[in-house]
Swiss-Prot record:
Cellular compartments per GO CC: plasma membrane
This enzyme's EC code(s): 2.4.1.345
Names of the cofactor(s): Mg(2+)
Name the UniProt record assigns to this protein: Phosphatidyl-myo-inositol mannosyltransferase
Chief subcellular location: membrane
Chain positions of site Important for catalytic activity: 118
PANTHER family in the cross-refs: SULFOQUINOVOSYL TRANSFERASE SQD2
Record gene name: pimA
Organism listed in the record: Mycobacterium leprae (strain TN)
Gene3D superfamilies, sorted: Glycogen Phosphorylase B
C-alpha cells in the first residue's frame, strides 16, 4: 500500500506529533508498506529519505503553546505536487485543524483520507475563524482517529463527527532496554522533568515550589531536566535550588530513554492543555514510576492512579508529599513499575500500528486512489 502522511509541525524541533508520525512511518515501512511523509523543515535539518520538506515554518500560537507551522499560499502548490507525485492509496493527515500542511491537503485532496486528531483544546481561534470552511472539508475524511477519549469528545462537540480511539504508540522494548546515563542511579535520588520548561502549562514553577519539601527528606536530591527552554531564566527563578538541578537540554530519543531509565521518579506537574500523556507511557515503558497532575488525560493513562501517583494540579505541597512518598518507599516504586509495565502493552507500536492499518484497509476498500481536486 502506498501511504502518504502529512505532519503539520516542523521537524526543526522535536515534538509529540512529529515523533508519532516518524515512528508510525518506520513501523509501516518495516511491514512492507510504501510510506512518504510531507512536513515543514528547514534546509539544514537532516531528514529520513522518505520525508519531503515543504519548506520553513514560522512560530504560531496554537493549543496553548507556540507551534512551528506552515500556512502560506506557496504551500498550496507544494502540497498538490507532492500528492500527484505520490500516487497514494491512502492519505493520512495529522491535526487537520492546525493552520498548516494538513489543512491545505484536506482542501485539495479527495479519495481515501484518514485523519488523526491529537489535541483536545476547547478554545481554538483557528477553529472559530475557519469553522464554516472546515466542516465541508472534514466531510472528505473517511477514517477518523482520535488519540484519546478527550480528543474524540472534542471532535464530536466541535465538528459533529465521531472517531475511533487509537492511542499514541511507543517502542516498549527500546525504552525498557535503554542504557542509563553515566553516574546513575544516584544515591541521593533523582526526579526527572521532561518537556518545554518555560511553557507555564508544563508546570515547572509548581515543581520548583515542591522541591524544598522534597529536600527536607532528601537533601541531595537532583532535579534532572530534559527539554527546551530559557535556561538562564529558570536558573534565576530557581535561586538557591539551582545546585540541585541538572540541565540536559534537548536530546534525541535515545537520550530521552536514557534519562528516563536513570531517574527514580518521573514527574509531570502539568497544569492543563494535555489531550493524552505519551511521556507518561514512555516513562512507564522505561521502568520509571510516575507522579503526575490529576488531569483527565493523565488520569486515563494512569488508570485513575492504579499505575502511577496522581496529585491535584498546581498543588506544590501535595506534589512534594507524593515525590517523598515514592522516593522513600522502594516497595511502592516497584509496585508502580510492575503495574506500569503491564499497562503499556496496549501502547506498543506492534498493537497501535495494527489498529491504524485496519483503518487504512477500511478506507481503501473501494480501490480508488487519492486524487487532487481540479
Amino acid at each position: 500500500m502506498r501511504i502518504g502522511m502529512i505532519c503539520p509541525y516542523s521537524f526543526d524541533v522535536p515534538g509529540g506529533v512529529q515523533s508519532h508520525v516518524l515512528q508510525l512511518a518506520e513501523v509501516m515501512r518495516a511491514r512492507g508498506q510504501q510510506v512518504r511523509v510531507l512536513a515543514p523543515a528547514s534546509p539544514d535539518v537532516s531528514l529520513p529519505e522518505y520525508v519531503v520538506s515543504a519548506g520553513r515554518a514560522i512560530p504560531i500560537p496554537y493549543n496553548g503553546s507556540v507551534a512551528r507551522l506552515q500556512f502560506s499560499p506557496a504551500v498550496h502548490s507544494r502540497v498538490r505536487r507532492w500528492l500527484v507525485d505520490g500516487d497514494f492509496d491512502v492519505l493520512h493527515l495529522h491535526e487537520p485543524n492546525a493552520p498548516s500542511l494538513s489543512m491545505w491537503a484536506l482542501r485539495v485532496a479527495e479519495g481515501p483520507i484518514v485523519a488523526t486528531f491529537h489535541t483536545s483544546t476547547t478554545k481554538s481561534l483557528t477553529l472559530s475563524v475557519f469553522q464554516g470552511v472546515l466542516r465541508p472539508w472534514h466531510e472528505k475524511i473517511i477514517g477518523r482517529i482520535a488519540v484519546s477519549d478527550l480528543a474524540r469528545r472534542w471532535q464530536m462537540e466541535a465538528l459533529g463527527s465521531d472517531a475511533v480511539e487509537i492511542p499514541n504508540g511507543v517502542n516498549v522494548d527500546s525504552l525498557s532496554s535503554a542504557p542509563q546515563l553515566a553516574g546513575y542511579p544516584r544515591l541521593g535520588k533523582t526526579v526527572l522533568f521532561l518537556g518545554r520548561y518555560d511553557e507555564p502549562r508544563k508546570g515547572m514553577s509548581v515543581l520548583l515550589d515542591a522541591l524544598p519539601g522534597v529536600m527536607e527528606c532528601f537533601d541531595d536530591v537532583q532535579l534532572l531536566i530534559v527539554g527546551r527552554g530559557d535556561e538562564e531564566q529558570l536558573r534565576s527563578q530557581a535561586g538557591g535550588l539551582v545546585e540541585h538541578i541538572r540541565f540536559l537540554g534537548q536530546v534525541d530519543d535515545a537520550g530521552k530513554a536514557a534519562a528516563m531509565r536513570s531517574a527514580d521518579v518521573y514527574c509531570a506537574p502539568n497544569i492543563g492543555g494535555e489531550s493524552f500523556g505519551i511521556v507518561l507511557v514512555e516513562a512507564m515503558a522505561a521502568g520509571t514510576p510516575v507522579v503526575a497532575s490529576d488531569l483527565d488525560a493523565f488520569r486515563r493513562v494512569l488508570r485513575d492512579g492504579e499505575v502511577g501517583h496522581l496529585v491535584p494540579a498546581g498543588d506544590s505541597a501535595a506534589l512534594a508529599d507524593a515525590l517523598v512518598a515514592l522516593l522513600r518507599n522502594d516497595v511502592l516504586r516497584e509496585r508502580y513499575v510492575a503495574a506500569g509495565a503491564e499497562a503499556v502493552r496496549r501502547y506498543d507500536w506492534s498493537v497501535v500500528a495494527s489498529q491504524i492499518m485496519r483503518v487504512y484497509e477500511t478506507v481503501a476498500t473501494s480501490g480508488s486512489k487519492v486524487q487532487v481536486a481540479s
